Amino acid sequence: MKIETVILDWAGTAVDFGCFAPVNVFLTIFEDAGVTVTLEEARKPMGMLKIDHIRTMLEMPRINEEWKRVHRQHFTEEDVHLLYNQFESKLMESLATYTDPIQHVTATVQQLREAGIRFGSTTGYTDFMMEVVTKQAATKGYQPDFLVTPTQVSDKGRPYPYMIFRNMEALGAKSTKQVVKVGDTTSDIKEALNAGVWAVGVIIGSSEMGLSEEEFLALTAEEQQQAIEKTKRIFEMTGAHYTIETMKDLPILINTINEELANETNDRN
């Protein structure tokens, strides 16, 4: 038994270093509604279906209280949908510019494909948004074998496992033990754990780290290591089986997992 399928998240994992396309829009729509939110608050639910992300932000105690202070009432589902409509409109204006593959992604995918591994993908974006992302990413060299969005699973995105299961079905994966899910948020890790597949957090370029490429490269070596260790701990506390610093580390990790699977088989025999 060995790994046959890898499922990658998109923004912050495969493209868009730091996952800035949605974050900047979340900050803007709340600012426009009279409620200032922090970068940390905007990032915390990252990886979820975007309307769920907005609802989760509104439920955060500080934002909830600030919303009530500004609007003189608790937020409503109408507020959620109004914010989401603004989010979608503003995101579509800039989404195409946030589709560059992160370093090592295309080379790693090619290397593992040559070893017979198939690549699926999941996302917190809708079908409509992903039409832009997939088209642009393909022109830049990144195109997984399959994509599932929350739209295709009745809006039951992360942390539900259904997008992973749909990928497994389409790609012919025989066992959850032969599937690795790589993502850059705690929602990705929870999705993988709920699906029973290997949960791997990628650190550099992740939404969880929250730095642009320029910001990360401007850090000293010591500061970079501190940021890496902090992000790694968050993934591990969420339950990740493994973490990798960049996608360049994925082939070696898959060899490690394959050895673990082989040892399990030998132990049973």
UniProtKB/Swiss-Prot annotation:
It catalyses: phosphonoacetaldehyde + H2O = acetaldehyde + phosphate + H(+). Keywords: Hydrolase, Magnesium, Metal-binding, Schiff base. InterPro entries: HAD-like_hydrolase_sf, HAD-like_sf, HAD_2, HAD_sf, PGP-like_dom2, Phosphonoacetald_hydro. It is an enzyme of class 3 (hydrolase). GO terms for molecular function: magnesium ion binding; phosphoglycolate phosphatase activity; phosphonoacetaldehyde hydrolase activity. Pfam families: HAD_2 (PF13419). Its cofactor is Mg(2+). One of its GO terms (biological process) is organic phosphonate catabolic process. Binds 1 Mg(2+) ion per subunit. Belongs to the HAD-like hydrolase superfamily. PhnX family. Homodimer. Involved in phosphonate degradation. PANTHER family: PHOSPHOGLYCOLATE PHOSPHATASE, PHOSPHONOACETALDEHYDE HYDROLASE. This is Phosphonoacetaldehyde hydrolase. It comes from Lysinibacillus sphaericus (strain C3-41). The lineage of its organism: Bacteria, Bacillati, Bacillota, Bacilli, Bacillales.
